[in-house]
Amino acid sequence: MSPLVARTLRIPAAGPSHERSVRFRVGLTWALLVLNVLTFYPHTWSGQPLILPIPSAIGKAITQGALPAALVMAVIVNRRLIVRPSVFLGLISLLVVEAFINALQARHFGTIYRSFRLGGFVFALWLLSPWWGRRDLLLVRSHVITTTVVLSFTVLGLIVSPSRALGGGRLGGAFWPTPPPQVAEFAAVTLGLVVVMWLAARFSGWGTLFVTCIAVLILYLSHTRTAILALVVGIFVAGLSMISAEARVRKLFASVGIVATLVAVTLSGVVTSWLLRGEGTQQLTSLTGRTATWLAVVNIPRNLFQVIFGFGLSNKSVNGLPVDSNWLASFLDQGIFGIVVSASALLFVLVTAYFTPRGVKRSLALFLATYCLVASFTETGFSDASTYLLELTLAASLLVPSGVNRRLE
């Protein structure tokens, strides 16, 4: 709410202690939403037992129970259920409506359950919308803190039991079963956000150096090419958005160019070997088997309704194999409608960022939106409750005007 309306309603200003309490509750709500979309299996990614065994029922109760807890916390912090008008959330809400339409004729309870879960997830995002656009980057910092906690447990697992954390040759969670692609995503997004904030003089140099060293090590051990490509492209786009105003950006680009040239000349064989991950030509051309699954998605028999609206929310797999593409997964679950809405939401964020005045919030939004765009081709997916939907929402939240909502304080 604008300060003018707040004064009209004669709402008293909140004290520092109350403001800290509000920030904590908003941050906790965001952390619970991240916990809700974390992967859980009763074993590590490579099939080994966890360092601290967690029964399957308890692990699923933690992740699935995080959403009701997030809703409760969001209602506590936003008791009047005030929401900020948002085109982005309006588009995402269309996916919820479409999911419930499919749920009316669902053959499996899982489709109905996932529809309600998506509805609750998006409702929680609506309840957090009054805190969008804050100058202190509250939601961005909350996301960085949350992902840092997840990565800390991953690194701790690597220290305690390297054989479990590096099972299968890729770094995954040994305390909590975070798979390598999600570990790499968290490391890449955290690194990208911190670097962009440092470029805009909103993060300390020593802190950025520490985060960079740890995140690069995690990315190296996770062997996830998509995350690295999305990170590089995202930082490049974000840097271009402020290269004319920040000398630090120009120095970074020049330094990276020199280092990249030296690496290409002296270590090209090592880098190529790491990127190949021991895969043959057939695996590379099929994107590690993804193209066969994508072809299976396209070839599934459909009637006209299913072409337009899909089969309903699922675990995004075909014949037991993950789809690993936001666009093909959207087509499977939500049809052409889901693809159009997902593309519209992403395009809205990018276009809004283009017309937003230059600044750190615009650069952060461009990094997140670009990261999601690059990753969307081989990862799922901001058409359902996921970390990618949270990150795209985070980008949208940075592009709204700053303001203080005193009715909530």
Positions of the model-derived regions?
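Interfacial loop-to-transmembrane-helix boundary motif in multi-pass membrane proteins
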Residues: 25-31, 85-94, 127-154, 200
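Aromatic-anchored transmembrane helix interface
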Residues: 60-66, 87-100, 107-130
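A membrane-periplasm/extracellular boundary helix in multi-pass inner-membrane enzymes
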Residues: 156-161, 239-281, 300-303
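Transmembrane alpha-helices of multi-pass inner-membrane enzymes
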Residues: 367-373, 382-409
